[in-house]
């Protein structure tokens, strides 16, 4: 680990010199690339330097104990040694985590697809609750959201809604939301007070560049139609809505939120590109050992990941067995406690995996 950290620090120093060089700065694309590399390792290097400083201080204190010093000073030094020894261990643990392989998509924007599942109108209302929860979470993170397409019901639910979340590290946190979300509550239409169970599925897809996924124009069919609102009534007098069908895979994407057909086509192509990327990734990962399917953050949308129990005010994340009792705050976007727990669990799995590899 130390050799790798030394190499990273050396690389960081080289990059620091380069990004300060006027001749490099003249080439903006190259300079931005180097700045990105520099920022990616900066936190590791700063933490490594704190670790080295703690080790140096620890050695200095141990050296002091070897000399003849008075009892009071000796007691102070011994106490400081205990604190520094703990700091060194903590730094080593933090550095191990920081050196874990990163998901290449973590820094990307995301598309989030929410669909009402079993439960009819109640499931559609729950899908709307999840949409609000994620938009509130995005606000807390300083991210921006943009609706790509929505199929709204007459009473304010969503049969399906697709939206984009733009912001640094959006995928790194939102990816843990992929899966089936289950809700247990008494619907407003239920006169007997009986608890109903409904579900909604969430898929989180990283935004992909044109270079990541190439789409042959001959492989798509584009249909245009008039945008419709609640109950199917027409809300536009021009054919501005767009439906794109990818013929080889049968994937269909619709977008009607914009007034201009060209804008709807651009949005639909972005979503199609993300879905094709997800499909390619799923096929690529199909050969990976079965045990990896059970890991945290596998992103399997068929997996039941979380239950929202309204009568008890409870949220349970089944992947890590975490239960918290603050349903109202959670649905208002205060979801970091669960996401942080999922990140920690995934890091622990990666550490274990690396340990097994070494064996």
Curated annotation (Swiss-Prot):
GO terms for cellular component: cytoplasm. Peptide chain release factor 1 directs the termination of translation in response to the peptide chain termination codons UAG and UAA. InterPro entries: PCRF, Pep_chain_release_fac_I, Pep_chain_release_fac_I_sf, Prokaryotic/Mito_RF, RF-1. The lineage of its organism: Bacteria, Bacillati, Bacillota, Clostridia, Eubacteriales. The modification N5-methylglutamine is found at residue 233. It holds the Pfam family RF-1. Keywords: Cytoplasm, Methylation, Protein biosynthesis. The keyword Protein biosynthesis applies. NCBIfam families: prfA, PRK00591.1. Gene3D superfamilies: 3.30.160.20, 3.30.70.1660, 6.10.140.1950. The gene is prfA. Its main location: cytoplasm. This is Peptide chain release factor 1. PANTHER family: LD18447P. It comes from Clostridium acetobutylicum (strain ATCC 824 / DSM 792 / JCM 1419 / IAM 19013 / LMG 5710 / NBRC 13948 / NRRL B-527 / VKM B-1787 / 2291 / W). Belongs to the prokaryotic/mitochondrial release factor family. GO terms for molecular function: translation release factor activity, codon specific. Methylated by PrmC. Methylation increases the termination efficiency of RF1. It is found in: Cytoplasm.
């Amino acid at each position: 680990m130390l050799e790798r950290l030394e190499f990273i620090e050396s690389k960081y120093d080289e990059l620091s010199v380069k990004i300060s060089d006027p001749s490099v700065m003249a080439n903006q694309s190259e300079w931005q690339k180097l700045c990105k590399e520099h920022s990616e390792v900066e936190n590791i290097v700063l933490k490594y330097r704190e670790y080295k400083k703690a080790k140096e201080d620890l050695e200095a204190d141990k050296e002091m104990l070897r000399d003849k010093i008075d009892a009071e000073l000796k007691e102070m030094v011994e106490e400081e040694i205990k604190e520094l020894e703990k700091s060194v261990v903590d730094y080593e643990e933090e550095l191990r985590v920081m050196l874990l392989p990163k998901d290449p998509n973590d820094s990307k924007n995301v598309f989030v697809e929410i669909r009402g599942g079993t439960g009819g109108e109640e499931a559609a209302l729950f899908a709307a609750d999840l949409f609000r929860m994620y938009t509130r979470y995005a606000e807390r993170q300083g991210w921006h959201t943009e609706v790509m397409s929505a199929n709204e019901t007459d009473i304010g639910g969503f049969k399906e809604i697709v939206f984009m979340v733009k912001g640094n590290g959006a995928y790194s946190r939102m990816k843990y939301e992929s899966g089936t979300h289950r809700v247990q509550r008494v619907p407003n239409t239920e006169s007997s007070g009986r608890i109903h169970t409904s579900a909604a599925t969430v898929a989180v897809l990283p935004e992909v560049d044109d270079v990541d996924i190439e789409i042959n124009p001959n492989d798509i069919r584009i249909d245009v139609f008039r945008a419709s609102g609640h109950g199917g009534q027409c809300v536009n007098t021009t054919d501005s809505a767009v439906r794109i069908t990818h013929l080889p895979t049968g994937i269909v994407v619709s977008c009607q939120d914009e007034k201009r057909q060209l804008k709807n086509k651009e949005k639909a192509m972005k979503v199609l590109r993300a879905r094709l990327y997800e499909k390619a990734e799923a096929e690529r990962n199909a050969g990976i050992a079965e045990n990896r399917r059970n890991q945290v953050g596998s992103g399997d949308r068929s997996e039941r990941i979380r239950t929202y129990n309204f009568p008890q005010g409870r949220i349970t994340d089944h992947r890590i067995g975490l239960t918290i009792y603050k349903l109202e705050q959670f649905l208002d976007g205060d979801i970091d406690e669960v996401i942080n727990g999922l990140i920690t669990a995934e890091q622990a799995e990666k550490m274990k995996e690396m340990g097994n590899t070494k064996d």
